């Protein structure tokens, strides 16, 4: 299978985990504590993956300076975008409770939530495509991290959308659209950087890593703590060790 097609396939699969989570939340009422537990575990998995699969490899391939600058830029881009979207009604887009506004309460919030969810998922998909450049195959640890974190993201956000009165067409249109864009982002990450210097690849990888960490701190971890409370840290630690084990065995 051509590498570009693999990038498209893995990115779409990763985005498809959001659709799976959305389907579960729409069909069944999942207890909030279960959602929070899985989300805390997924946050730990992602932290491990971005540390060992992204930042560490970016430093080895392109050096410390491009990695540091890229990481800070990625965090700044996410935080800035998140602040703008929060003003438009997307502040609680990952919340499973009644925090999400309806379109009636906050006109334009539906679009903001959809754009926010897209911004959350794109960096993860880009690094799947970029990872193919380095190893010739998708990173098992990074793929597992994205899949494990995306299911509770889709589940929690959809539960909140449902309570806010969003229609099935809006909910599933949003997640299916993001799955498609995730595939395209992975494809772009591979094709655009196929012949790029190592420093550029390191810089782009670090941008994605910085965005992912900012997303975790601003959205996933607060949602996990809301219901899971004192066990959030322990559950995240188990997730971290699980991803590190996959990385160590796979490496």
Which residues does each PLM region occupy?
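Intrinsically disordered, metal-sensing/regulatory segments
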Residues: 1-251
């Amino acid at each position: 299978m051509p590498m570009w097609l693999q990038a498209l396939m893995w990115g779409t699969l990763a985005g498809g985990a959001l659709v799976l989570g959305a389907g579960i939340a729409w069909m069944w009422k999942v207890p909030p504590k279960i959602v929070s537990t899985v989300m805390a575990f997924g946050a730990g998995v992602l932290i491990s993956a971005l540390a060992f699969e992204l930042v560490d490899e970016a430093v080895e391939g392109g050096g410390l300076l491009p990695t540091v600058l890229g990481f800070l830029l990625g965090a700044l881009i996410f935080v800035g975008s998140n602040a703008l979207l929060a003003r438009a009604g997307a502040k609680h887009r990952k919340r499973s409770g009644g925090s999400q506004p309806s379109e009636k309460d906050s006109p334009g919030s539906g679009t903001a939530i959809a754009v926010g969810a897209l911004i959350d998922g794109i960096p993860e998909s880009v690094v799947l495509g970029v990872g193919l450049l380095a190893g010739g195959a998708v990173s098992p640890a990074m793929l597992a991290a994205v899949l494990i974190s995306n299911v509770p993201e889709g589940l929690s956000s959809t539960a909140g959308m449902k309570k806010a009165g969003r229609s099935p067409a809006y909910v599933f249109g949003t997640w299916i659209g993001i799955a498609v864009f995730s595939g395209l982002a992975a494809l772009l990450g591979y094709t655009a950087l196929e012949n790029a210097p190592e420093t550029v690849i390191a810089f782009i990888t670090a941008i994605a890593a910085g965005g992912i960490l900012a997303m975790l701190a601003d959205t996933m971890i607060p949602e996990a703590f809301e219901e899971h409370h004192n066990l959030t840290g322990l559950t995240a630690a188990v997730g971290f060790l699980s991803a590190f084990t996959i990385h160590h065995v796979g490496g």
